[in-house]
Amino acid sequence: MRFVLDTSIFVNPEIRRKFGDNPTEAMRTFLGYAEMLFGRVEFYMPPGIYREVMHFVDEDELLPEIELYIIKKPPNVHDIKIPAFVVYELIDDIRRRIDKGLRVAEKAVRESVIETDNVDRIIQKLRRNYRKALREGIVDSKEDFELILLAKELDATIVSADVGILTWAQKMGIKWIDAANFREVLEGLVAKMGEGKNL
């Protein structure tokens, strides 16, 4: 059994809380599960995701376990085939998002003409809504794309709370687990292993 891990498990406060009060504590708790499952379950991170996580944790507190239990592997970008429909969907999605972003900008301009004394507030609202229109639900970074490609290559399960990653995992037929449920999944795997059941 293989899992490809996203940063959201350790960084997103709502998700991380199940593992610990801060990213280092959350990673330490996860590594405890990884140790119990060692040899039966593999945990992967693409290098970009690993670097992101390392910005948030105290690496010295997690050595050597973090090196033992998390496999850092880039996807083989030269050999992975992506179906043409994925590119079509991506282009269509980007076009819809650009149009939606344009409507958000137009609305902000109209509001600023009416409320000239609240321009800063309107700009803040524009940025928030524009970001939401363009980025929510889409793979918006190279690191996110590497995560998806690696899971595809390994036939692994993605663990993430990122809506864009999970949406594209579904579109590409990749198994996934919402990071909000990951601790319970790990506990279930440890229990099955303790009972001598196959994973």
Curated annotation (Swiss-Prot):
InterPro entries reported for this sequence: PIN-like_dom_sf (IPR029060), RNA_free_RNase_P (IPR014856)
Annotated NCBIfam families: PRK04358.1-3, RNA_lig_partner
GO MF terms, alphabetically ordered: ribonuclease P activity
Source organism of the structure: Thermococcus onnurineus (strain NA1)
One Pfam family per UniProt: PIN_5
Protein's UniProt keywords contain Disulfide bond: no
Protein's name in the database: RNA-free ribonuclease P
Enzyme Commission numbers on file: 3.1.26.5
UniProt entry tagged with the keyword tRNA processing: yes
Coiled coil: none
Function: RNA-free RNase P that catalyzes the removal of the 5'-leader sequence from pre-tRNA to produce the mature 5'-terminus.
UniProt keyword list: Endonuclease, Hydrolase, Nuclease, tRNA processing
Catalytic activity as recorded in UniProt: Endonucleolytic cleavage of RNA, removing 5'-extranucleotides from tRNA precursor
Top-rank taxon: Archaea
Family that this chain belongs to: Belongs to the HARP family.
GO BP of this protein: tRNA 5'-leader removal
